[in-house]
C-alpha cells in the first residue's frame, strides 16, 4: 500500500554534516522524499511533539537534544513506507540495530540516534500535520 510517513533528521545529523548520507539510505530503500524543510524546534514544540513520552525518564534529555540545533523534517512516500522506514532506521539503541541501518551505521548513542520515524498510519498523519501546513501538503497533490 502506498503510504506517507514522517522522518526527522535529528540535530546530530545536521551537526555532523551527514544529511546527504542519511538521505541516500532513504532513497536507496525505494522511498521518495516528497517534501522537506529545516527548522529549529522551540522547547514548547518539542514537548508537544513528544508529549507521549512525558512520564519517561528520558523525556527531559530528549527535549534538550531536540532543541539543541536544527532538524530536517521530511515526508517520505512509498510502498509500506511506515514499516520500511522503521526497518532502515534500525533499533532505537544503535548497539542493537542491524548493520546497514541508519542508526547502526551513523548513530553515536541511544540519545543521539539520528532519526525519528512514525510508528503507525495514525501517528504518521498526526506528525506530518504537526510540521507541515495544509498549504504545503496541498502543493504535493497539485
UniProtKB/Swiss-Prot annotation:
Short name of one Pfam family: NDK
Reactions listed under catalytic activity: a 2'-deoxyribonucleoside 5'-diphosphate + ATP = a 2'-deoxyribonucleoside 5'-triphosphate + ADP; a ribonucleoside 5'-diphosphate + ATP = a ribonucleoside 5'-triphosphate + ADP
Residues reported in the UniProt entry to bind ATP: 10, 58, 86, 92, 103, 113
Family: Belongs to the NDK family.
Entry keyword set: ATP-binding, Cytoplasm, Kinase, Magnesium, Metal-binding, Nucleotide metabolism, Nucleotide-binding, Phosphoprotein, Transferase
Key word Ribonucleoprotein present: no
An annotated GO cellular component: cytoplasm
Cofactors named for this entry: Mg(2+)
SUPFAM superfamilies to which the protein is assigned, alphabetical: Nucleoside diphosphate kinase, NDK (SSF54919)
Stated role: Major role in the synthesis of nucleoside triphosphates other than ATP. The ATP gamma phosphate is transferred to the NDP beta phosphate via a ping-pong mechanism, using a phosphorylated active-site intermediate.
The enzyme's E.C. designation: 2.7.4.6
Subunit structure: Homotetramer.
Superkingdom field: Bacteria
Active site positions, chain numbering: 116
UniProt subcellular location: Cytoplasm
GO biological process: CTP biosynthetic process; GTP biosynthetic process; UTP biosynthetic process
Main subcellular location: cytoplasm
GO molecular function, one term: ATP binding
Protein name as annotated: Nucleoside diphosphate kinase
Organism: Ehrlichia chaffeensis (strain ATCC CRL-10679 / Arkansas)
Amino acid at each position: 500500500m502506498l503510504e506517507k510517513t514522517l522522518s526527522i533528521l535529528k540535530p546530530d545529523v545536521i551537526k555532523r554534516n551527514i544529511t546527504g548520507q542519511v538521505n541516500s539510505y532513504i532513497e536507496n530503500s525505494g522511498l521518495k522524499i516528497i517534501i522537506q524543510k529545516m527548522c529549529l524546534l522551540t522547547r514548547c514544540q518539542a514537548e508537544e511533539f513528544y508529549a507521549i513520552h512525558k512520564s519517561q525518564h528520558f523525556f527531559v534529555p530528549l527535549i534538550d537534544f531536540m532543541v539543541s540545533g536544527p532538524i530536517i523534517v521530511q515526508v517520505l512516500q512509498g510502498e509500506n513506507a511506515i514499516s520500511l522506514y522503521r526497518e532502515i532506521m534500525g533499533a532505537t539503541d544503535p548497539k542493537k540495530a542491524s548493520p546497514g541501518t541508519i542508526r547502526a551505521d551513523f548513530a553515536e548513542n541511544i540519545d543521539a540516534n539520528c532519526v525519528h520515524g512514525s510508528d503507525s498510519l495514525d501517528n504518521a498523519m498526526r506528525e506530518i500535520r504537526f510540521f507541515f501546513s495544509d498549504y504545503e501538503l496541498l502543493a504535493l497533490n497539485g
